[in-house]
């Protein structure tokens, strides 16, 4: 039986005014097939699918990930700070939770080819790893801008035998990569499954990705009870499309639906503050004339519209044209956000905030220096948001991924912005 607590996941996937299935007619059979598979295998654990997934994410992925105290951050902020260490999951980020779940679901559905988009390269890497483990052909679409700033992950994907296709149209970032992946899916819908990387897209993707990622907050609730003796006062997570955000928040808002969780894990916890940290870039706002936003803060400043199959909050012009977004972090560089996140912000359950590029870069160095943890630039936004937190209870920062993929970007951006970067490097010649 399903442990589903959110009735919307069994209808059209709407969350208040957001969500839905805004897709071309050619994709509706695939979306309907996936919705049926989601309800049968994920929500109702048909054929023991969820049991299989939970076993694989433990043995292959290395779950559970630890909850660790950050003493220097705690002293700096005058409150106990804990880190949920998704950087220690196999592959170095939270992305494997969803990628392994969806590739496994595709196997159960009888599909024999996987396509996926990626921004920072972490979702592409996780999908390529899952496909290698489950013997599925894999094709990844990645914007040319992201290919250039995330070369280590491009190499990792190819090591796992994935084909990586640079997308050269538009700004060459995540939005364009999603567009190209959807075109591929529409062309090859009979035998191909699209492993979308975030809580975006048409139903059932936002609910399904949330459910796979909510294993983060399942563990976090249990670990908090054991280590703190109580739930945290607040959880802070970065927000781009929103997969790690809903993973960190899902079990606290009561909407995640993956069977097999300990009793009470998904009961709403309204006393836990949830802070979603967006990329403030260089400044907020949208330049209508240039069709450009120097940020990726859809929750903070976006307006309602439709993108990639769902109604949500978007960075767009007054006439409804999606603009090019910006963030120093490739994984947050997206002009939209998941529909459930948009709804939870509207209802006041989640508090949106934003951090600019310079503050994120400074937080990258601070966590590396003070706690021995090199965070992804995405995570660095959440770490920087601790400066905005004024509560007095324990706070958890979700470390969505590790930062080795970002070292070239950090060195270049830190030098350009005169931020205290890595020590001077000397080249010694024999």
From Swiss-Prot:
<dbReference type="Pfam" id="PF00291">
    <property type="entry name" value="PALP"/>
</dbReference>
<protein>
    <recommendedName>
        <fullName>Tryptophan synthase beta chain</fullName>
        <ecNumber>4.2.1.20</ecNumber>
    </recommendedName>
</protein>
<dbReference type="InterPro" id="IPR023026">
    <property type="entry name" value="Trp_synth_beta/beta-like"/>
</dbReference>
<keyword id="KW-0822">Tryptophan biosynthesis</keyword>
<keyword id="KW-0028">Amino-acid biosynthesis</keyword>
<dbReference type="GO" id="GO:0005737">
    <property type="term" value="C:cytoplasm"/>
</dbReference>
<comment type="subunit">
    <text>Tetramer of two alpha and two beta chains.</text>
</comment>
<keyword id="KW-0057">Aromatic amino acid biosynthesis</keyword>
<dbReference type="GO" id="GO:0000162">
    <property type="term" value="P:L-tryptophan biosynthetic process"/>
</dbReference>
<dbReference type="InterPro" id="IPR001926">
    <property type="entry name" value="TrpB-like_PALP"/>
</dbReference>
<dbReference type="InterPro" id="IPR006653">
    <property type="entry name" value="Trp_synth_b_CS"/>
</dbReference>
<dbReference type="GO" id="GO:0004834">
    <property type="term" value="F:tryptophan synthase activity"/>
</dbReference>
<comment type="function">
    <text>The beta subunit is responsible for the synthesis of L-tryptophan from indole and L-serine.</text>
</comment>
<dbReference type="InterPro" id="IPR006654">
    <property type="entry name" value="Trp_synth_beta"/>
</dbReference>
<comment type="pathway">
    <text>Amino-acid biosynthesis; L-tryptophan biosynthesis; L-tryptophan from chorismate: step 5/5.</text>
</comment>
<keyword id="KW-0456">Lyase</keyword>
<dbReference type="InterPro" id="IPR036052">
    <property type="entry name" value="TrpB-like_PALP_sf"/>
</dbReference>
<comment type="similarity">
    <text>Belongs to the TrpB family.</text>
</comment>
<feature type="modified residue" description="N6-(pyridoxal phosphate)lysine">
    <location>
        <position position="95"/>
    </location>
</feature>
<keyword id="KW-0663">Pyridoxal phosphate</keyword>
């Amino acid at each position: 039986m399903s442990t589903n607590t959110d009735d919307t996941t069994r209808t059209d996937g709407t969350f208040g005014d957001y969500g839905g299935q805004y897709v071309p007619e050619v994709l509706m059979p695939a979306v309907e097939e996936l919705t049926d598979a989601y309800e049968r295998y994920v929500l109702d654990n048909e054929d023991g699918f969820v049991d299989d997934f939970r076993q694989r994410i433990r043995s292959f992925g290395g779950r559970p990930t630890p909850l660790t105290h950050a003493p220097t951050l705690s002293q700096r902020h005058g409150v106990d700070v804990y880190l949920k260490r998704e950087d220690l999951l196999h592959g170095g980020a939270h992305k494997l939770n969803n990628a392994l779940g969806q590739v496994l679901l595709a196997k159960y559905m009888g599909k024999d080819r996987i396509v996926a988009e990626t921004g920072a390269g972490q979702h592409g890497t996780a999908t390529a790893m899952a496909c290698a483990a489950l013997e599925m052909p894999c094709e990844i679409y990645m914007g040319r801008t992201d290919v250039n700033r995330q070369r280590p992950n491009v190499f990792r994907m190819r090591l796992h035998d994935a084909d990586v296709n640079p997308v050269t149209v538009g700004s060459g970032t995540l939005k364009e990569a999603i567009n190209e992946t959807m075109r591929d899916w529409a062309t090859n819908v009979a035998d191909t499954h699209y492993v979308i990387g975030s809580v975006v897209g048409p139903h059932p993707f936002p609910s399904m990705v949330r459910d796979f990622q909510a294993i983060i907050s399942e563990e976090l609730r249990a670990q908090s009870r054991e280590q703190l003796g109580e739930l945290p006062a607040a959880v802070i997570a970065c927000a781009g499309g929103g997969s790690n955000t809903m993973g960190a928040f899902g079990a606290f808002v009561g909407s995640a639906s993956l069977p097999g969780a300990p009793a009470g894990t998904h009961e709403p916890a309204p006393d836990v503050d949830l802070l979603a940290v967006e990329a403030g870039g260089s400044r907020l706002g949208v330049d209508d004339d240039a069709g450009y936003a120097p940020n990726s803060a859809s929750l903070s400043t976006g307006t309602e519209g439709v993108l990639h199959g769902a109604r949500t909050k978007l960075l767009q012009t007054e006439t409804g044209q999606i603009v090019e977004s910006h963030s120093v972090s490739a994984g947050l560089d997206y002009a939209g956000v998941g529909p459930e996140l948009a709804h939870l912000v509207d209802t006041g359950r989640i508090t949106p905030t934003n951090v600019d590029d310079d503050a994120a870069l400074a937080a990258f160095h601070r966590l590396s220096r003070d706690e021995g943890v090199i965070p992804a630039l995405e995570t660095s936004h959440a770490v920087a948001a601790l400066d905005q937190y004024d509560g007095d209870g324990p706070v958890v920062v979700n470390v969505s991924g590790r930062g080795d993929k970002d070292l070239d970007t950090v060195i270049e951006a830190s030098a350009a912005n005169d931020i205290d970067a890595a020590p001077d490097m000397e080249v010694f010649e024999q």
